Amino acid sequence: MPPSIAVIIPCLDEETAIERVVRGMRAALPESAIYVYDNGSTDHTVEKAAEAGAVVRTEPLRGKGNVVRRMFADVEADVYVLVDGDGTYDAAAAPRMVQRLLDEQLDLVNGARVSSLAGAYRAGHRSGNALLTWMVARIFGDRFRDLLSGYRVMSRRFVKSFPAVATGFEIETELTVHALELRMPVGEVETRYDERPAGSVSKLRTWSDGLRIVRTIVRLVKEERPLQFFFAIAAALAAASIILAWPVLQEYERTGLVPRFPTAILSTGVMILASLSLTCGFVLDTVTRGRREMKRLHYLRERAPVPAAHGVSSTIQRRGVSGST
């Protein structure tokens, strides 16, 4: 029996694009179930999505992360196609991404955006994405080229083991780190990235959302790499302690006296804080390893992607689709 596919589309005030997105996904994956989760639109997004044939649901808590959390909890399928409702992603790439996930038994296929249009991918967003992708690659592993892509194909065990915490656009960072931390089999496919349709406005605020993503990366480092995080703090504190103590030690070596007691006490206190920080790092590293093992066991409880040997690959090639509702 072929795997079921669900296309899940978070959106907010996308009346100019949502109908085209739904119809495009229906043409690319005609046997899939398409869900549009509205995040409190004030225009005709809900009506347009329903007219296009999507199952429309609402999430009152504002923020893309809240919508993704709700979709992952509500929708049941074997394969999930997550795509933004702004009309910038190429629906025709979906069958290729689904096929790769099934053929190679991957848990995540990321759609790496490629665009030759100057207005499609703003320079600030491009450079910010490159910087954030580099940061995550240095800390968690270099397996993706587009950290903030809103176009992903995921297995059921990826979705149902994902503990969504983010509330906004930083959800993409969490999705990526989830795959990297559990060492899941992943892949990446280049996809065309187009301009938004006329009248559609991006909800991404370059600076504020960029800072939220940076804070998310710092939080994930603290939670997933506590030893490195607290070692860095301990090293900074130890360096400050040594800098404070150095003139006191020189004075003691020269005169045999310690006339600067406040500085000596401060230096000692800072070094104690450094030791405590390092101790916290070791303790939390042990806790994190246990938590990661539990997440891995929960991940393994879910069904794996169906391999191509079950005839799914030929179905995609023949009809541009795999799965049933």
Please identify what each model-predicted range represents.
Residues 14-17, 41, 64, 90:
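Donor nucleotide-sugar binding loop of glycosyltransferases
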Residues 38-46:
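A conserved acidic beta->alpha catalytic loop
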Residues 1, 165-166, 171-325:
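Hydrophobic helical membrane-anchoring modules
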Residues 80:
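Short aromatic/hydrophobic "clamp" motif used to bind/position activated sugar donors
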Residues 13-27:
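Short, well-formed alpha-helical segments that are part of the catalytic scaffolds
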Residues 4-6, 33, 174:
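Cell-envelope/extracellular polymer assembly enzymes that use nucleotide-activated donors
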Residues 84-89:
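The conserved acidic donor/metal-binding loop of glycosyltransferases
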Residues 59-74, 91-169, 173, 194-211, ...:
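Acceptor/aglycone-binding surface of glycosyltransferases and processive sugar-polymer synthases
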